[in-house]
């Protein structure tokens, strides 16, 4: 409703949905559920992107998510699913009730970083942050390349498009990068745009 029809917090259904989401936000600031009790920067960012677009950008709950996202970045300035940085598979969701902390020395995931950057791009203040710009450069460096992790690892996933945006693909990445203020003259952006011309 938010992406396709522009619904915002004035609509009772959106207000009720936001209230529900805020009710299960963790003390740390993230949203959990899709991976059980495991951290999920992409899940938290995906929810928060819609909240920002629905008019909650100044809400304290949203601010807490941004603080959490910045605290859980990899050392290279991107994001990854923390349990993946510990070489865990999806079975960790059922087997581990304890939340697995990330190994921040491991590389970022382009898929996760692209999803997280969408919430930064949606927010008028955070889109101008140095952290968003650093992560944007990382995302561009991976265009048409394989991800570092198992989830949607193949380079072919760059060309599996969806709207509303869900995972990171070429269109969602270009949309995000443009909102972050990157120039169309960047080499990787030119290469990405050339794909559409061919």
Residues of each region from the PLM?
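An alpha-helical repeat/solenoid feature that recognizes helix-turn-helix modules
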Residues: 1-14, 32-64, 74-191, 198
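Beta-rich carbohydrate-recognition and catalytic domains
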Residues: 67-68
